[in-house]
From Swiss-Prot:
Its EC number is 1.2.1.38. This is N-acetyl-gamma-glutamyl-phosphate reductase. Belongs to the NAGSA dehydrogenase family. Type 1 subfamily. InterPro entries: AGPR_AS, AGPR_type-1, NAD(P)-bd_dom_sf, NAGSA_dehydrogenase, Semialdehyde_DH_NAD-bd. One of its GO terms (biological process) is L-arginine biosynthetic process. GO terms for molecular function: N-acetyl-gamma-glutamyl-phosphate reductase activity; NAD binding; NADP+ binding. Keywords: Amino-acid biosynthesis, Arginine biosynthesis, Cytoplasm, NADP, Oxidoreductase.
Length: 345
């Protein structure tokens, strides 16, 4: 059995990760750690775990003393809060999957620019592998530190990479318009996330400044083998979970829609969690799953190709992709513990 611990277990991504690992046939959950709910029972915070998990959450400060008891540590903390514990875990040969942003960007300078935090573990930036499972599987297999991708970058990168790998688009023309459920903003109390503030309304946020922008650009630059700068505009919509990413770009040459579909189906032919569909993606059809649904349209009037993708931001955009990466790291069947049919309604 894989002995696992989670720090940041009482956030939304941490809660979903706890649910997945608690049901994983190859995992024993050794501890759950929480800064805000230390020494409280996990099921007092999340009543869905009543009679399921009786553990008390340990405090974040106790995690270091428990590293000897685990093989892998999942960190689901705010930006800038992982440096000390991840450094210690790596030193003690504990594998780490970080669900936050601290190891996604390879440049400490870019991290400072977008997060306004001085990176304290620059060496680990070089060692960390970006955990976009379908794209970087071989590197993930041998890594001890995985930077789990963000939710918007997961949906957008999976949508766009086949176009880049096949040199189909003008890379200077990429625009990403994305919508997210409110859980993407996290569990911390915020006026903007109160029911009356976000219900019955939709709003853009982080326009021209969202922190996921350089992460998406870094991934697409790596895959295109050329520098990519793009426009990314996220929106908050009044639903609990889900992301719909709509990606626009100009075609380099005329191509038929069925040809593009063939390219996508070939690119993702061995990927059980990528569904190339004819109908337009909807977040309700991926809810509670590790699936990413992708559809394509071409607007011949404007020479634009539009790729749409839908994921569950707490699953493929966070917790279930982290479990997928753990499965890869340990040589398990990739679908183990996350082979879940989307829930509806």
């Amino acid at each position: 059995m894989i002995q696992a611990g989670i720090i940041g277990a009482t956030g939304y991504a941490g809660e979903v990760l706890t649910w997945l690992l608690n049901n994983h046939p190859n995992v024993n959950l050794v501890f759950l750690a929480s800064h805000s709910h230390g020494n409280s029972s996990f099921n007092s915070t999340y009543g869905n775990f009543t009679n399921v998990i009786e553990n008390l959450c340990i405090d974040d400060n106790e995690v270091e003393d428990n590293l000897d008891n685990i093989d892998i540590l999942f960190t689901a903390l705010p930006s800038g809060k992982t440096f000390s514990i991840v450094k210690k875990a790596v030193e003690e040969k504990v594998k780490v999957i970080d669900l936050g942003a601290d190891y996604r960007l390879k440049s400490a300078e870019v991290y400072k620019e977008w997060y306004n935090i001085n990176h304290e573990c620059k060496k680990l930036l070089k060692d960390a592998v970006y955990g976009l499972s379908e794209i970087y599987r071989e590197k993930i297999k041998t890594s001890n530190l995985i930077a789990n991708p963000g939710c918007y970058p997961t949906a957008s990168s999976l949508a766009l990479i086949p176009l880049l790998k096949n040199n189909l688009i003008d890379t200077s023309s990429i625009i990403i318009d994305a919508k997210s459920g409110v859980s993407g903003a996290g569990r911390k109390a915020s006026t903007n996330n109160l029911f009356i503030e976000c219900n019955d309304s939709i709003k853009a946020y982080g326009v021209a400044s969202h922190r996921h922008t350089p992460e998406i650009e870094q991934t697409l630059t790596n895959e295109a083998k050329e520098k990519i700068t793009l426009t990314f505009t996220p929106h908050l919509v009044p639903m609990n979970r889900g992301i719909l990413s709509v990606c626009y770009s100009n075609l380099k040459k005329e191509i038929e829609l069925n040809e593009v579909y063939d390219i996508y189906k070939k690119f993702y032919k061995n990927e059980p969690f990528i569904r190339i569909i004819d109908t337009l993606p909807e977040t309700r059809w991926v809810k509670g799953s590790n699936y990413c649904d992708i559809a394509i349209r071409i607007d011949k009037r404007t020479n634009k190709i539009i790729v749409l993708s839908a994921i569950d931001n707490l699953m493929k955009g966070a917790a279930s992709q982290a479990v997928q990466n753990m499965n890869i790291m340990y040589g398990l069947a990739e679908k183990t513990g996350i082979d879940l049919t989307p829930m509806f309604p």
